[in-house]
Amino acid sequence: MEQEQDTPWTQSTEHINTRKRGSGQQTQKLERPNSIQLMDHCLRTMNQVDMHKRTASWKQWLSLKNPTPESLKIRVLKRWKLFNKQEWTN
């Protein structure tokens, strides 16, 4: 049977569990995650990031005390200008 060669990708995705016992150090290699596990991990991470962004956004809106339509309009226009400036620089 042919063994899979280690590539930078497989080396980076390999889980390694290291434990110290006595004076020596023992390294135990666990199975490489399969593609479904990797996709699941990526989706969970992206969902956590998305939730954090939404929470931060709501906190910003809630931090405004009694926002008026005019103050909201100014805030949106400032964000729009900043966004357009970033588009031009990229």
Swiss-Prot record:
Q: Where is the composition biased (Polar residues)?
A: 1-15
Per UniProt, subcellular location reads as: Host mitochondrion inner membrane; Host nucleus; Host cytoplasm, Host cytosol
**Positions of the record's site feature: Low pathogenicity:** 66
The UniProt entry's GO biological process terms, in alphabetical order, are: symbiont-mediated perturbation of host apoptosis; symbiont-mediated suppression of host cytoplasmic pattern recognition receptor signaling pathway via inhibition of MAVS activity
Further information: Is not encoded in all strains, and seems to be dispensable for replication.
Q: How does it assemble?
A: Oligomer. Interacts with human SLC25A6/ANT3 and VDAC1. Interacts with host MAVS.
Family, per entry: Belongs to the influenza viruses PB1-F2 family.
Could you identify this protein by its name? Answer: Protein PB1-F2
User: What is the species listed in this Swiss-Prot or TrEMBL entry?
Assistant: Influenza A virus (strain A/Duck/Germany/1949 H10N7)
Lineage, broadest ranks? Viruses, Riboviria, Orthornavirae, Negarnaviricota, Polyploviricotina
